[in-house]
């Protein structure tokens, strides 16, 4: 089983797409999900215009990932979190990573990416509106706001808290974005 955690408006084919908001697919079979793949993760171009459309998307399950996850230990093949960890506080992130590590099978993958804050500053220093939008998000609601930033070093420390071990942690691009990001894969 593969989980797409905090999926937002992106419905990833072949994954159980979970978020705290959205229409659960069985409840609204009439609604066509924004279904996509890693190769075309974002089917819409980046839009800097604030909108109130957060809950108008389809998910498979509504899950609060800040509570104990329902999946048993060592049962999940892959967990994907794209542009999501920065939407949680540092302490919430600690809990989320703990749950991800718990549910992943040995050899299971945690695929992630998040904004590259330093490169964002470098590229958008002269465009304050875009800089603020990329750093803090659009703040349509409590979920659509950035609460922390990471770099490779701080994210690696987060992954290894409480002596968690990973067979490998590799930083690489996992999804194409129109703005600077840091991505990677951690293998349990």
Question: Which stretches of residues belong to each language-model region?
Answer:
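Conserved SAM-binding loop
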Residues: 3-122, 184-188
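S-adenosyl-L-methionine-dependent methyltransferase catalytic module, highlighting the catalytic core
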Residues: 89-105, 109-187
């Amino acid at each position: 089983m593969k989980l797409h955690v905090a999926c937002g408006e992106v419905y990833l084919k072949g994954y159980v797409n979970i978020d705290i908001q959205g229409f659960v697919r069985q409840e609204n079979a009439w609604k066509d999900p924004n279904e996509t793949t890693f190769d075309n993760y974002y089917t819409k171009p980046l839009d800097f215009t604030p909108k109130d459309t957060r809950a108008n998307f389809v998910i498979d399950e509504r899950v609060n990932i800040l509570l104990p996850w329902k999946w048993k230990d060592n049962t999940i093949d892959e967990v994907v979190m794209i542009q999501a960890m920065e939407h949680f506080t540092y302490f919430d992130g600690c809990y989320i990573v703990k749950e991800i590590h718990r549910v992943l099978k040995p050899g299971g993958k945690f695929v992630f990416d998040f904004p590259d804050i330093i490169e964002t500053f470098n590229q958008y220093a002269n465009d304050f509106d875009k800089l603020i939008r990329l750093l803090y998000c659009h703040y349509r609601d409590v979920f659509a706001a950035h609460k922390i930033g990471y770099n490779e070093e701080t994210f690696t420390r987060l992954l290894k808290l409480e002596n968690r071990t990973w067979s490998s942690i590799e930083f690489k691009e996992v999804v194409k974005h129109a703005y600077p990001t840091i991505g990677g894969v951690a293998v349990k």
